[in-house]
């Protein structure tokens, strides 16, 4: 039996949008694409200029959400992933209540990463430098020789939280 495809009416607000949609539907039906009339070239510096790279990183990785993984990587409490590709060390985990949490992957004492693996499962995150311990909610839970740190406020020294969300199976 042949497959019958029905087209739904689209809510289009302008002639330009209508033309774009019609072109896309025509291209799909004809298994083709629109091609530009001539080969285009741009300056090679668009791809090699370090200043442009810095601008792109500042805009794309600092002002917009980034995808760091799939929810399947964080299916159970304690599972975590790290992400370092944007120049910011990120740690994402699922806490004991099942909520996603994201933090700077940086110990608040001396700046070491508290998770060095790309992914894994942990009950706590421990800094390899001085063994400060953080729970799955990012709270500082312990340190060796706490009597040497009597003047600090442990509540204010948790991992630095970052915004995080789940959309369409992506984190």
Per-region residue spans from a language model:
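Rieske [2Fe-2S] iron-sulfur-binding domain
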Residues: 73-171
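Residue-level signal for well-ordered alpha-helical segments
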Residues: 29-33, 37, 45, 60, ...
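Short, mixed-charge, low-aromatic patches
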Residues: 6-16, 36-38, 61, 139-145, ...
